[in-house]
């Protein structure tokens, strides 16, 4: 049985080493517990077995633990200007032996999910390993040597979804300079790179190498919707509505950019509508009284 509170205490102690007066540090602490909250909801709604749910919560708690050292060393959260933060998170966990009490297969499953949480797509070897299992071993908790591969893939999907769900909240409510490195006033004068808009039209994630402007990053956030794996995740994003708010409060100066923003929002709305109109009762209850983030 995984003692989540023990790991939570470790995270709190580790994060306390860094300067909370820096809004970016506080942002990541709040984000971590918000992702944990979303993960709890996804696990409950998907009726995951306790073992898988326990590992999923560890993925949520530690997925961004490398962010603190990234900020300390490079003074930025931008991976392309510093280091891959998922890889750094895994390095921190390994070097500090944080997960050593877990069985090796569980430890490696958590690390694999964390390593994959920020990538453009899940490592094909992870997907291939799961798909090579017999159908009767695909269900989580099923006996046999193949079920662990299916569980690893499930953990990858869960942490990618939970992280993206809360990134929309961060996008809408935190200081934009902390989030993307530019103010909303600066972004209002920017344009959207054609390659970024093309990715959105194809319902694809945006390769960070294609981004040229901060507004490109905003569009990249919208494209997260297309990479969500579960209907429950789509409904969380749709119901909270955070994805729209920065666009709604920004007066874009360039007419072409304004038109493209409108097109992008309409495309995302239409995509989410295809996942159905009915919000499950348990999910409605979550929105009425969301769990505490810390």
Short names for language-model regions:
Residues 4-8, 107, 152:
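Alpha-helix initiation and N-capping motif
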